[in-house]
Structures are given as C-alpha cells and as structure tokens.
Amino acid sequence: MSVGLPGPHSLPSSEEASNSGNASSMPAVFHPENYSCLQGSATEMLCTEAASPRPSSEDLPLQGSPDSSTSPKQKLSSPEADKGPEEEENKVLARKQKMRTVFSQAQLCALKDRFQKQKYLSLQQMQELSSILNLSYKQVKTWFQNQRMKCKRWQKNQWLKTSNGLIQKGSAPVEYPSIHCSYPQGYLVNASGSLSMWGSQTWTNPTWSSQTWTNPTWNNQTWTNPTWSSQAWTAQSWNGQPWNAAPLHNFGEDFLQPYVQLQQNFSASDLEVNLEATRESHAHFSTPQALELFLNYSVTPPGEI
C-alpha cells in the first residue's frame, strides 16, 4: 500500500484559514486529499515514537519526596515491642512479691536444735523432720542452707577479728612499766630497757650537792643526859646488877626496877661529883676531835675497839 505525499497544492492558504476561522459556524468539509494527508502525518508520528525510547524513571524529575537522611525517622510501633518492658516489670514485681516462709517459735527451736546436732541432713531425715514440723521438704532444705551460710559468715568474721587483733598486738611497742618507775626522772630509757648515754650522764644530784653536813640536831645537842649524869660508874653498881639473860620480849618493868633503886641510893655528894664530871665531859665533847671519836665509837661495836 503506497501512501502518496501531499503536494504543495493541497495546503490551504492563509486567506482560506482566516476565512475558515471566521466562518466557524459552517461545517468543515474535508476532501479526499485531506484524508490522505492526515493518514501520512499519523504514520510519521508513530515512526518517531518507535525510534525514540521512552524516558526511564531515572530521567524523570524527582517529585517532592522526603530525604531519608534529613527526614525524621519513624519508629515502627508494634504491639510486641510495647509488651516487652511491661512483661519485664511484671516479672520483677512477681519476684519481689514472693512470699517468705514464716516459722513459728516451736518450729524454729526444733530446727535450731537439730542444726546444732547435725548440720547436713539426708533426704530421708529432711522428709521426717518436715513431716514432724508440718513443713514441706523444700522449706526445711532452704532453711538448713541459709543457716549453714550464716554460720560460715559468722566464723569468717570471727576469724578476721582475731587475726586483726593479733596483728595489732604484735605491732604495738613493748612497754616496761617497772623500768620507767624504778629509774628517776631525767633518765632516757630505750625500748630495750637499758639506760642511754652513760658517758654524758652527769652524776650530780641536787639533793646531794646542796646537802650540808651540818645537822642542827647534832649542833644543838647538849651532851647532858640525865641518865648519864645521874649514873654512877662505880664497880659496885655493876657488881650489884644481876646479869640475867632475859629474853628480849620480856624487856619491861622487871628490867627497869634495879635501875630505879640504884638512882634512889645516890647521895648529895655523889650528885655534886657527877655534875662536875658532866661539865668536864661537856667541855671535852664540845671539841670536834671528841665528836669524831664519839661518832666512831657509836658506829663500831665495843668489842672491836
């Protein structure tokens, strides 16, 4: 089938187009030549569409779709995700609300008594004890386990306390109260108990350095003793004295009676003689040589002179 191309004579002129625009009310009458032109233009359009491919989705202009990087992320809320934390909270509450076994006083006494005798029970023994105390096997088993743990914890704490006490006692410095008390103040005593700095110790005692060897009792002593002055040193008095070896515990009035009788037998002349002898002895003993002789005599026994 051959399609004839329309020639230049078939195109309408501008005047005809204007006339056709003005006469819009009149129906357009197409001639057979015009039909052939329409068919040719339709075939050309089909060919161009087949030659040029359709634009792909990539070539199409993007519409206002939200960017995944800039747009806020939408969290998918599912009923399973919502139930997760609620179920966990319920489990925690169920664990906290677990009822603890409340033992009576009689049950506790029986359990403690049995624990002191035997800390580990067999299956049969636990069943017998649970039946006696109206408890379950699990309750008795749990109580014994907890009691053993408490006992071990208590033993561990006691061991730590005793070990710490021994360490503190071993590290404490040793004190010597007897040494500190026996030595006078001013001496430095080492931990070993020995005196320090013997060479630098000055052996000057203020009490000894300031001591004056003048005793007021000795200076003011009057060597006039009534017993010495009234004593008659005659052989008669010594001969008349009975030399009885009386025990020391009987030293009393019996021993003093002859001495009193001897004083009563003195006469006036004897008294004058004794007074003169006393004055002479006082003058003699007032000298330092006599004082030194008297001191030496008082210190040494009579048999060693």
From Swiss-Prot:
Entries under CDD domains matching the protein: homeodomain
UniProt-annotated stretches for the region Required for DNA-binding: 123-152
A GO biological-process term: negative regulation of cell fate commitment
GO cellular component: chromatin; nucleoplasm; nucleus
Segments of skewed composition (Polar residues): 65-77
Swiss-Prot/TrEMBL Sequence repeat ranges: 198-202, 203-207, 208-212, 213-217, 218-222, 223-227, 228-232, 233-237, 238-242, 243-247
Subcellular localization: Nucleus
Region called Disordered, residue ranges: 1-30, 46-95
Outcome of gene disruption: Loss of pluripotency in both ICM and ES cells and differentiated into extraembryonic (parietal and visceral) endoderm lineage.
Annotated region described as Sufficient for strong transactivation activity, given as residue ranges: 248-305
Record's note on what induces expression: By the transcription factor POU5F1 in ES cells that acts as a direct biphasic regulator: a steady-state concentration of POU5F1 up-regulated its expression, while an elevated concentration of POU5F1 down-regulated its expression. Up-regulated by the transcription factor FOXD3. Up-regulated in ES cells by transcription factors T (Brachyury) and STAT3. Down-regulated by p53 in response to DNA damage induced by ultraviolet light (UV) or doxorubicin. Down-regulated upon ES differentiation by mediating autorepression through interaction with ZNF281/ZFP281.
Tissue: Not expressed in oocytes and spermatogonia (at protein level). Not expressed in many somatic organs, ovary, testis, fibroblast and hematopoietic cell lines.
Pfam families with a match to the protein in the record: Homeodomain (PF00046)
Other noteworthy facts: 'Nanog' is derived from 'Tir nan Og' the mythologic Celtic land of the ever young.
Subunit organization: Interacts with SMAD1. Interacts with SALL4. Interacts with ZNF281/ZFP281. Interacts with PCGF1. Interacts with ESRRB; reciprocally modulates their transcriptional activities. Interacts with NSD2.
Family per similarity comment: Belongs to the Nanog homeobox family.
Name the UniProt record assigns to this protein: Homeobox protein NANOG
Native source species: Mus musculus (Mouse)
Source organism phylogeny: Eukaryota, Metazoa, Chordata, Craniata, Vertebrata
